[in-house]
Amino acid sequence: MKRKLRIAVATDDGKTMRFGHFGDALEYHIFDYEDGRLTFVETRKNLLTDEALGIEEHDNPMKARMMREQLSDCDVFVGHSMGLKNRQKLEEMGVKMIPLVKKGLSIEEALRRALEKLGLS
């Protein structure tokens, strides 16, 4: 039996993966991956956009800690990009960030590519 993973995918429209920083997505679609199957869990509104926090600089380490708290049950973050310092900080906290650079990916295709990068498909 493979270990269960909880995956957060950044999205602004509920259909496609957000093209831009993971931390500025309007919401996250949360999925569980276990025994080769993906199951949708829920949609979570992002309360930590730079605008909401009043942060002007990207890659602020405070935001990485707050993102980890907001998505504390997630093992993998899937999105277009994330600042290097934040990505390193999250990896120190046990979160794997999977960057996917193609614009317009459906959430399903983003998940498929992320699982492939994790060696799970």
Language-model features, listed with the residues they occupy:
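Non-catalytic interface/targeting segments
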Residues: 1-62, 100-121
